[in-house]
Amino acid sequence: MGRAKRVVLAYSGGVDTSVCIPYLKQEWGVEEVITLAADLGQGDELGPIQEKALRCGAIESLVVNAQEEFVKEYAFPSIQANALYENRYPLSTALARPLIAKLLVEAAEKYGADAVSHGCTGKGNDQVRFDVGIMALNPSLKVLAPAREWGMSREETIAYGEKFGIESPVKKSSPFSIDRNLLGRSIEAGPLEDPMTEPPEEIYLMTKAIADTPNEPEYVDIGFNQGIPVSLNGENLAPVTLISQLNDLVGKHGVGRLDMIENRVVGIKSREIYEAPALLVLIDAHRDLESLTLTGDVTQYKRGIEDTYGQLIYKGLWYSPLKEAIDAFILKTQEQVTGSVRVKLFKGNAKVVGRQSVNSIYSPDLATYGAEDQFDHKAAEGFIYVWGLPSKVWAEKTRGK
């Protein structure tokens, strides 16, 4: 008896997930494989994916357009949280995984599957994100991860697939592993595994090389409503359209590249190249608007929560109780975060140069050093005495010892 009768497989069209189809059937005795591809803005690569899955042995191939859900339910909360992993990575790839896990569970329940499957290896982050997400959404579903168990090298995997007519898109001249969605691209493997090797320019698609960027700066006004981006240069835009247009605008100026060594969930370090032009600029602009509309103590407390939020996303805990509790806090903080932020784009740099809000708690009359100054300077002496009293008492008791 096989490990499962009917399986829903997360399918990308790449060699690993394509090989999973015959492997599940031939090696693990699965009777029926249904593939599911989530359209998260990958572009043309989804075109032939259904035909390829059926050719590899799937009984049905599903493509779910989840771009709007991806932006509204996953990207926007992350922007409200200013979520960055290790203070740099805006989680453009990681954010897609809990949504794909949700779609897998929904498809399994709809089609009566007794298991779901993915093509993640045993040393990556995605296996954790998928498995934990699926467990949280439907604990009764089995999760099959053939690539984690089959023990084949990359070359052996390609050779196995060739027996079933599966061609590999990975060539010696382009040995990179690439993941793409509307929020960005991640590139790894090949020569990038040497941390001293400069990434070749041809791996970048969303961002221009500095030499090819415009010679004049460009400004963009980003409008927010309760922490959610809603407009560009005064024009209200649908969520997917806003991200897409901002990607093009920001990437044109060479903004949005990351080259970093990160700590994976499984305990190893990896070298990752990311392109996430819109997401990086939106987080920067949103954080700046918060500085105008939130009190200092809320801002400072939220910064610590933001780091935890990024960790939860990266480590596959999107559906955890802690994440849900933090969401409630963040939503409360965003009630006043409405306004616009002006960003200057030029030669690989995105710089906030202006911000405004009807909820601004910045008072020019209190901040100015000019004649309009309304700050009560005399009150400072009493404040300083009370503020410094613990230090004064401590010094009196300890300095003489």
Swiss-Prot record:
Molecular function as annotated in GO: argininosuccinate synthase activity; ATP binding
Reactions that this protein is recorded to catalyse: L-citrulline + L-aspartate + ATP = 2-(N(omega)-L-arginino)succinate + AMP + diphosphate + H(+)
Cellular component terms per the entry's GO annotation: cytoplasm
Main enzyme class: ligase
Biological process per Gene Ontology, one example term: argininosuccinate metabolic process
Coiled coil: none
Localization of this protein: Cytoplasm
Residues binding L-citrulline: Y89, N125, R129, S177, S186, E262, Y274
Assigned EC number: 6.3.4.5
One Pfam family cited in the UniProt record for this chain: Arginosuc_syn_C
Disulfide links within the chain: none
InterPro entries, per database record: Arginosuc_syn_C, Arginosuc_syn_N, Arginosuc_synth, Arginosuc_synth_CS, Arginosuc_synth_type_1_subfam, AS_cat/multimer_dom_body, Rossmann-like_a/b/a_fold
PANTHER family hit by this protein: ARGININOSUCCINATE SYNTHASE
Pathway the protein acts in: Amino-acid biosynthesis; L-arginine biosynthesis; L-arginine from L-ornithine and carbamoyl phosphate: step 2/3
Chain positions recorded as ATP binding sites: A10, Y11, S12, G13, G14, V15, D16, T17, S18, A38, G119
Name listed for the protein in its UniProt record: Argininosuccinate synthase
Record's keyword terms, sorted: Amino-acid biosynthesis, Arginine biosynthesis, ATP-binding, Cytoplasm, Ligase, Nucleotide-binding
Amino acids binding L-aspartate: T121, N125, D126
Family affiliation: Belongs to the argininosuccinate synthase family. Type 1 subfamily.
Record note on quaternary structure: Homotetramer.
